[in-house]
Amino acid sequence: MSQTGSAGLFQPVTGRIRGVLRGRIAAGFYIHRMNRLPKRLLGRRELVDFPAFALGGVEAKVDTGAYTSAIHCTNIHLETNAPARPVLVVDLLDPGHEGADGRPLTFPDFVLRDIRSSNGEVQERYVIRAVVQLYGEHFEAEFSLSDRSDMKYPVLLGRSLLRQGRFVVDVARRNLSYKAQARAAARRARP
């Protein structure tokens, strides 16, 4: 039987493909087709960094059922200065969170969008673009702003971010990105 089309996806091969050794793939990476870049694994729960907000190690839930990512905010309101456009002002995370200094953040660029919650209810939420760090790389994604104080995790990572970063979720694991960054930092620190 010949191997044509998608039947030969996992053939053993040798050589280099886009910087990744075929047959010998670094931990946390998965090649699902030979002609594409490897996909990276994320656990069901991850620790993420927001460099623009000077926040690191924020607990996030990876949710393949949500399209848009979300971040916990309180005191969400608009401030209008006479000649300028309105500015969105929020308190990001709770004051008890490490790194949250209690100062309000302002966002001049935002949109108001209908977001369907997990229970099927449609809510109008403000959406911003923010940079999140996973596996030492920065990804810009849309985050809806909502009060997630009744949720266990202040950040939710949705499908649009997962697709952009070519991530696959392994629900049996956690903090894969954070552990990979720690290993890379330890390797750099060695003489």
Question: How would you label these PLM feature ranges?
Answer:
Residues 12:
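Cationic, low-complexity basic patches in intrinsically disordered or flexible, solvent-exposed regions
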Residues 22-33:
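Short, Lys/Arg-enriched N-terminal segments with co-localized hydrophobic residues
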Residues 31-191:
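Pepsin/retropepsin-fold aspartyl endopeptidases
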